[in-house]
């Protein structure tokens, strides 16, 4: 065969090697799978491949924001949400999590480390499932063409029954039933094929399988033909002859050598018995000697362990010089034979090592571990209130801890403390608080305002003193209140005249009184109003379209009534399946015309979005089955058997922190050995704690790692809640039928920390969207009118429109003017009620709320102020609520100025095990809820202890 022909054959074989490995390859673009029939067909292909294919690949290109994550691909059962196969990115801890159904029915999870996918950049990830039908499949993760991690010998995948195929669902790019943040460029699943072929699809030069080489070899043999085979056969026979000839020559040489030695012995010594060459032994002591035919007639075995040489002469091996087996700083002593290491150097602990031979010395090196002197129970000998820092082989004593003054020689003494008035930095009208890191802070008492070190009277209890205070830190709460008698915690002043808008009769300074001004906060002397609403053109976000609510969802300055793209997602309202919620991808899994981003039942068709009980779950998928009573139905609860209304899931593994033994998934259990984890919400497997205060370095000042330091964080153990904010709220109307009164009108000020209700309205609620477990909730209540005498208050543990707690206050005794369906009489005084209405909003709940007392199947009166004193016009009151739903603890206190005027005492009720917060009004106008503050708190107060004992004895 000529060379050109041979090169052509080789080229053809190379082409075959590339294509032969991909004969059964199927590529499916998952982003195009939409219709149910198409999804069933794709699911059947995947099911078949799991049973028959050699390998299955998931190839995706996407971009995730830093520390974000979500499900890349999942194959689930619609009926019971069984997770057959799922691959997700856990951005916070830099891994890919693969979960699948095992043959025993349990879910198996595989962590693939070193992913580095959630960093705001575009990555290509290839997940290879090797041998899914084998008893022990494997997983490989390639990130940007490089192998990141792999696992072999995994438990077998459970086969998907054929009957399940029609009920299978494929999900891509999701996080908690919503689209995950970022951008998914492509998502393909490849059934069968080789790594070489898949690498070509992703432009990655992966090596092919051995099967390709075998195919090339087979093809080459078939092309070269019978003549070459015959030639190869002859060459093989020739080679065998050469081997036999070489063996014959070797035997001849041995025989000739024996004859020569015999002749020489006969000539020199005559004919006598042959002398042994091994007696006496010419070999080194302890080395075996063997008689041989070759000169000099003997052969010595190998030198003993620890020695080297030819068997005749053996010298000691210096293991210390050649293997360096001892820890740096520990002396190595060479012996004859062998070596030994002396004790570990000071500051280290370990074992002495000794042995014989280079191999042993290299495999058994001495290990000495650093001694952490700072954890010896004596702070390393440093002052107990100072910082001890461990170093490699030693330690050093540092400065005094936070809250202490001094040095190592004089000792560290408390600088500020809450335990002793002599060391307390707080004002006489302030109370001392311990922060999480041991620092001390001060907070002015109710009726006083300032920075805590300096406090002054605060008549309207809005957090600002009546007179300016000489504070060293220039704290804003030391500035004089611009409305002394009317709460305005935001200190808004549109015309900058030093008088706050809340008490300025001409807030914008345009010469027109507020009651007559159609733009209270914008100067407009001409009072021009082009449309028919009550807002002048100068302050109307739709000057030519009537819109009294002035709603502006996307905050672009253009009201929703005249904005062609209300949510600002780039999709016109008429084409947007979520007109008021940004969703540029327009994902709609249930194909009901309502996008998943705003769908109250994203997996079940409900185009009308009916939600009769206002619990944010559509009626068609609302089961109202809530085993733990935390306001989340079991099918959507990440801890269905433990109350956790906040649904906090720090590691995004689908298991709520309340029932997750390792909240941050760093391998250190939260509470049990080898824990407890000193940073329970932030991954830190090394548990480094430089100052030894029990809090890891990575979460020292920010326990939940939400970029808000703990003293300023209202929920230091939840990265989802940082500040009090009611700007996003849900309006719940409790008497939606009839037109006797109008609905409430809520105005939110001070960045969500102040709410004003302006209308004489039907009963209604403004409910925030943040749900709480244990919570402390406080605020200032003020009725800014003298023309009405009805109900106002606040609510907590809101779960739906028929289940919540409400604290409500009536000014005077009054019988409700509608006696249907029953007569309702309101008594003056503060009341605490548990609403457990079986009917929900309507006339029954309306009259039950008005009535002071129990109403079967509607409202239970838990407590009422025995003074029967109503609120006074234009007077500020401060409430403080403590609620610990895990034990049913409730306590409400009410202050008028600095004086405590009402205290419910400890009340035990477990009707609602957590929920959302909000405010309440019923037929009362001009209510101000100012200086609102909430704080997550699961610590049970000390005054619960007597009730705990009674609960254990079954007496409560």
Swiss-Prot record:
Keywords: Calcium, Cell adhesion, Disulfide bond, EGF-like domain, Glycoprotein, Repeat, Signal. Adhesive glycoprotein that mediates cell-to-cell and cell-to-matrix interactions. Can bind to fibrinogen, fibronectin, laminin and type V collagen. This is Thrombospondin-3. Residues 316-354, 370-410, 414-456 form the EGF-like domain. Residues 727-941 form the TSP C-terminal domain. It comes from Mus musculus (Mouse). GO terms for cellular component: extracellular region; perinuclear region of cytoplasm. Residues 555-568, 612-628, 650-667 have a biased composition (Acidic residues). One of its GO terms (molecular function) is calcium ion binding. Disulfide bonds join 278-289, 283-300, 303-314, 320-332, 326-341, 344-368, 374-388, 382-397, 400-412, 418-432, 426-442, 444-455, 471-478, 483-503, 519-539, 542-562, 578-598, 601-621, 639-659, 679-699, 715-936. TSP type-3 repeats lie at residues 457-491, 492-527, 528-550, 551-586, 587-609, 610-647, 648-687, 688-723. InterPro entries: ConA-like_dom_sf, EGF-like_Ca-bd_dom, EGF-like_dom, EGF_Ca-bd_CS, NOTCH1_EGF-like, Thrombospondin_3-like_rpt, Thrombospondin_3_rpt, Thrombospondin_C. Residues 22-193 form the Laminin G-like domain. One of its GO terms (biological process) is ossification involved in bone maturation. SMART domains: EGF (SM00181), EGF_CA (SM00179), TSPN (SM00210). Residues 1-21 form the signal peptide. Brain, lung and cartilage. It holds the Pfam family COMP.
